[in-house]
């Protein structure tokens, strides 16, 4: 009997050591030393009762120290965010057995590489609803991501109910038809497109004020800041459906519904119209009331300017301001809204187009273009150049971070617009590529971009987001010198099983 007892003990130790060697954390921590044995606790959930906590101001912001010994678990952090991220690590370490949780013995010292670790969800083209958004928030938190960029307005749909402006959802939250699933968008010329429609009404879909506040509160409990985007002065066809007088040529607005075509509508806000300014100030006041984020995204991308060049009111504004080019009107409205938001203690963020027209120096730029001819053809100020000029930047080159692009999977059942970002390309992304060392402090981070022209529902969304957003989480959290794609794939084999067990429609690994 004594001999059998020793055999059992050795087997248990071997099994525990094997589990420690197979630790698979995503994103990878800054430092980790695996130990021998494990800590076992009754129960099936990771909560604050399972560890001892100590506040330590020496730990970096959002960072933590974690020690799992056979006798218990201890966590140290300087702030609640660090404590929360330690708990996410514990959730990934936990192995559920019959009525107990087992944690491999390990010591971890961890903190993020970047401050801005985000994901964009586009609900202008397709609407997913708050439960799907909450699910995305849960998964972001699980991967230590901290910014949800919520794209709430588009040519194809207006998704927020603004008090005193019922027409926005009455006319802007639905469209009479949508592009047919599987149909391909054809470019017929500058800002001219064609695609087969399905003839089916889409919507009305929108969020009430209570819905918006619920999502903001839900995210805050998970240490995620919700940054709302109201895209101006282009991508506004849904608002123009509600208020045709806000565009340069109202007589051209014959359909009082959102845009039915993918691509960019040439109907944009009239910058020469004082009513446009009043409208935007009222919308952004509501946004400030609902969203506590210091940063408010004002879009600014892909704005066609042909109507401004012909519009008498825009011409009058140009003459009054001494402008020689219609494009300067975009800089004017950017600065006007930035000043208005500054009165509310807020800071604007916009796509890189805003940087070409003298944006305020405290504006945050979001670099998406790789060449100046993209979008509306505005002068390209690259992310690296903008950082050198002193702008804080979120780096999002579409060739690296637009996860609505194809994944390179054989037999992929979902539709994509084009482009290719396989998992290894997503993982190789460097937000500081090309940025001179002295300007890297201005690179806040990056985010996964989930544009929804070809994302039709929550299953489609999850498939395209994960596992590439796992790669993004590691790009933004893990120290660059610690990154290793082969090791990431090894960890992802186990981590993907976790995600699937959680109900995530995670795409296969290569």
Model regions and ranges:
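Feature activates predominantly on carbohydrate-active enzymes
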Residues: 60-267, 271-295, 336, 340, ...
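Flexible loop/turn segments at secondary-structure boundaries
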Residues: 127-129, 155-161, 233-239, 297, ...
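Generic recognition of stable, solvent-exposed alpha-helical segments in well-folded globular domains
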Residues: 132-135, 207-214, 275-282, 328-336, ...
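Flexible, acidic glycine-rich loops studded with aromatic residues
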Residues: 348-353, 358-363, 367-510
């Amino acid at each position: 009997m004594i001999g059998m007892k020793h055999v059992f003990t050795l087997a248990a130790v071997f099994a525990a050591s094997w589990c420690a060697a197979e630790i698979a954390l995503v994103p990878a921590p800054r430092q980790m030393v695996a130990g021998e044995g494990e800590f076992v606790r009754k129960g099936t959930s990771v909560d604050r009762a399972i560890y001892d906590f100590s506040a330590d101001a020496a730990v970096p912001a959002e960072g933590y120290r974690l020690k799992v010994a056979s006798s218990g678990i201890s966590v140290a952090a300087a702030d609640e965010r660090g404590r929360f991220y330690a708990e996410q690590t514990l959730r990934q370490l936990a192995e559920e057995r019959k009525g107990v949780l087992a944690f491999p013995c390990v010591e971890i010292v961890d903190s993020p590489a970047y401050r801005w670790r985000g994901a964009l969800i586009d609900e202008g083209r397709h609407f997913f609803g708050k439960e799907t958004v909450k699910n995305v928030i849960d998964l972001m938190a699980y991967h230590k991501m901290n910014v949800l960029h919520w794209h709430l307005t588009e040519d194809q749909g207006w998704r927020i109910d603004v008090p005193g402006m019922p027409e926005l959802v009455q006319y802007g939250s639905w469209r009479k038809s949508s592009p047919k699933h599987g149909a391909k968008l054809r470019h017929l010329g500058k800002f001219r497109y064609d695609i087969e429609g399905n003839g089916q009404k889409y919507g009305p879909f929108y969020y009430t004020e209570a819905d918006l506040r619920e999502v903001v509160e839900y995210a805050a409990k998970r240490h995620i800041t919700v940054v709302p985007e109201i895209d101006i002065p282009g991508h506004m066809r849904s608002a123009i459906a509600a208020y045709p007088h806000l565009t340069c040529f109202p007589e051209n607005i014959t359909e009082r519904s959102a845009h039915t075509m993918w691509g960019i509508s040439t109907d944009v806000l009239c910058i020469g119209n004082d009513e446009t300014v009043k409208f935007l100030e009222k919308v952004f006041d509501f946004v400030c009331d609902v969203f506590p984020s210091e940063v408010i995204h004002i879009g600014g991308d892909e704005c066609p300017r042909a109507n401004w060049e012909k519009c008498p009111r825009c011409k009058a504004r140009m003459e009054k301001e001494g402008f020689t080019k219609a494009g300067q009107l975009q800089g004017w409205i950017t600065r006007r809204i930035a000043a208005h938001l500054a009165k509310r203690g807020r800071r604007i963020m916009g796509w890189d187009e805003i940087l070409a027209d003298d944006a305020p120096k405290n504006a945050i730029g979001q670099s998406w273009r790789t060449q100046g001819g993209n979008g509306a053809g505005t002068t390209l100020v690259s992310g690296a150049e903008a950082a050198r000029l002193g702008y804080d930047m979120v780096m999002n080159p579409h060739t690296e971070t637009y996860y609505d692009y194809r994944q390179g999977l054989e037999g992929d059942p979902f539709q994509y617009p084009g482009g290719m970002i396989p998992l290894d390309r997503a993982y190789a992304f460097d937000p500081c590529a090309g940025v001179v060392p002295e300007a890297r402090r201005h690179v806040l981070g990056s985010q996964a971009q989930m544009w929804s022209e070809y994302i039709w529902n929550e299953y489609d969304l999850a498939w395209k987001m994960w596992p590439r957003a796992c790669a993004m989480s590691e790009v933004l959290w893990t120290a660059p010198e610690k990154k290793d794609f082969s090791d990431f794939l090894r960890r992802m084999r186990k981590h993907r099983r976790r995600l699937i067990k959680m109900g995530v429609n995670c795409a296969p690994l290569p």
